Amino acid sequence: MLPLYPKKMQKKLKLAVIALCYVPLAYAQTDETQSQKAAAMDESAFTFTEAQLGDNDDMSQNVTIIGSNNNMYADRVGFLFSPVRFRYRSLNQKYNDVHINGVLMNDMESGQFRYSLVGGLNRMTRNADNVLAFENGGYNMPNMAGGVNYDFRAASFAAGHRVSLGAANRNYTLRGVYTYSTGLMPSGWAVTANLTYRWANRGYVEGTFYNALSYFLGVEKIFGNHSLSFATWGNPTERSTQGASTDEAYWMANSNFYNPYWGYQDGKKRNSRVVNDYAPAAILTWDWKITDDMKLTTSVFGKYSMYKSTKLNYNNTDNPQPDYWKVMPSSYYDVFDESNEANRTLQALGNWTTAYSMFSGSKANRQINFDQLIYSNKMAAENGQDAMYFIQAKHNDALTLSLSSAMNMTVTDKSKLNFGIMLGTNKGSHYQTMEDMLGAKSFHNINTYALGTYTMDDDRVQYDLNNRNGAVGEGDKFGFDYDILVSKGFFWANYSADMGRWHANVAARTGGVQMQRDGKMRNGMAPEFSYGKSGKAHFGELGGKGSLTYDAGHGHVIALGAGYEWRAPQASTAFAAPEISNDFVDGLKNERIFSSELSYQFHNSWLHVNLNGYYSRLNHVTEWQNFYFDDINSFSYVSLTGLRKAYYGVELAARIKMSSMLDLKLLGSMGEGKNTNNAQVRYMNSTKATYARETAYVKDMREAGTP
């Protein structure tokens, strides 16, 4: 049943939800990097930046670190294809596990690793151990897109000083790096330190800036068969962002780098979208070499991440964005449909010409006019009105604690056994604050979206019934405030053995996940189910995989791998409308994941070839997102459940030795990642907290962010 709107409005909301389910994201950055052993690559060849690597919550970005000593395709594809935003096998980054000293670093809510955690620490991430999905891992059962373990022990870095200075025309324009390491000293101590600074007063895109300081300090003491190492690092960053616009705006601005997020205030440039990101982290690792064939590694990790992203918003007035569709020429006159007589009148043509002249005639006209917004707010304040325009900030903070312990054993000369446990807990705090009132004198914690449906004295317009009509000043919370609590633990093991020409590997993992919401505001749309803690959702996890490799001789090697897992859904998709209530998504289930791979390798003195074929199938996938629906002035929260997905394709890599000084390298991939069924969609909007259900006809729609 649709919410109680006029029929025309119901139809628009329904169409918007279905369109959202149909269309993959218009823009999703997908960067990968080479994860070879670091010494083989010059640092200047490829550098991560936060904007490339997915710490911007405004976009869906997926970065995959892959590498292999045995698979030439996996060893090179991330680095070589990164400029075209290639995503390994079309897989979401949550299927790629990133570890530091054996501790899993992927975010416990989203499952993804945020590369801003190690931003600027290129030298520190050079000591890496990579595994593919069906290889033997010493720190976990490898995920479907493989994994990597970074070694942050101070003694692992080469002794000496290293200074690097660089200039670039990307998000930052200047970069300086200083690294110092003692190496392992005769006393058994080792110290490593790194300092990186990246800066841009203006990035490549106008209206952007960048300011980031990265630091690392590691200390290690080796005594007898034991080693204790401690490392702490962080990457405090302040940067502004660029916004995607339409072809119409790019055409009139005469630039594909037009950025609608900035404008002039007192004659100076100001960006409305500014990100502040800082996640200080520390890890303590104990290594115990029990015997020459047995080693125990235990690590304790802690991190407190603080992420804030600002945005220009408005209240009971027109949208101030300069590229808002209602002020663009195309909203007045239809230049494409000659039969649309209503929008092809002389008056409409005149409006089109006026809008075109306004937008294209002056740079200031196509940017945010902060001075005008401040003036409007001051006039409203004189009349006793709340802020019409303001800068809000969304916060995603998290406190993470993790423990990992792994035993690595050489059972015989031809067999190895690895097993271990991981425990972790995460408290994610999500809230909104008033960043800048832009000259206004007052603002109140009222759901202005709902005022078109309910009167001012109705409880349902209150964001917090525990503090009705709460006054909001700069720095105060408003709109929503809640925590997501996640705890997880699992046991893993893998065993590998050589048997003549055969090599076998088996791995297994079992554990559980618990998740819960803790609301800090009693929302008027859900007064009984928004304040305080929700119930707890529990999910068991179980999985196994195996591979068999045959060395046929004369350089020919064939390998086959397959696995099946039950994986818990992510907490970031588990709640139907987390900004409003404690409700879990209906039909929330474990993902069922089948993965398989067949590969062939040939290697001789002048030719090296890798050919891989893969097929993966996912069942009971849950996806969640929210969006602003302009026609009804409301945010909508959308959950898709029961999704099935398939990923399949072939990969080819070849290196031909043309001469002693020249190699020809070929790399290619052809694959598919898509939905294989229509899903159930359940949605609600912020103006009337009732749910509607539909069928989303998403079968054969391709994975978002892929070609």
What are the residue ranges of the model-derived segments?
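Acidic/polar loop-and-plug regions of large Gram-negative outer-membrane beta-barrel proteins
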Residues: 222, 227-285, 308-392, 456-473, ...
